[in-house]
Amino acid sequence: MGGSNMVVVESLNKVCREGELEHNYSYRMTKGKISLSGYENPIELQSYGIEIERQDIVKGDIINIERDFVKDISCQRYKVHKLLRLLYDNSVSPIHLIDIIGEYIDKYIEDFDNQLKEIAIN
């Protein structure tokens, strides 16, 4: 595995309160590269992913942090942005990330194939 350095390209934040408990949510779109081998020369495509972090805070102290991410969801930034908004608008917790976006991931995997076909044609 090469150094997969992901860069955060968009971040949406919100705070939800339940009595004394405060949840700080961060929804981030990450950008990286996916390397596809099996060709004469390995092909690198731009890819976008999502990371969600939730900090649970009581009286200013962080008592718990949950985080999960999925990289390489699609090479189409707008699709991942829409997913990010969906998660943000519904205050989705990191622990539910995979449940919510699993079916999208299965669909969007085709984007990489389509991108490869375009490269092959040109």
What is the predicted function of each stretch?
Residues M1-S37:
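Negatively charged, low-complexity tracts enriched in Asp/Glu with abundant Ser/Thr
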Residues E18, Y39-N41, F69:
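Residues embedded in well-ordered secondary-structure elements
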Residues Y25-P42, L84, P94, I98-D99, ...:
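A positively charged, amphipathic N-terminal helix/segment that binds anionic biomolecules
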Residues I34-L36, I57-K59, Y78:
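Generic "edge-of-domain/loop-turn" microfeature
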Residues P42-R67:
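A short, structured beta-strand/loop element
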Residues I62-R77, K82-D89:
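A short, exposed loop/beta-hairpin motif centered on an aromatic-Gly-Thr core
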Residues R85, D89-N122:
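C-terminal charged interaction modules
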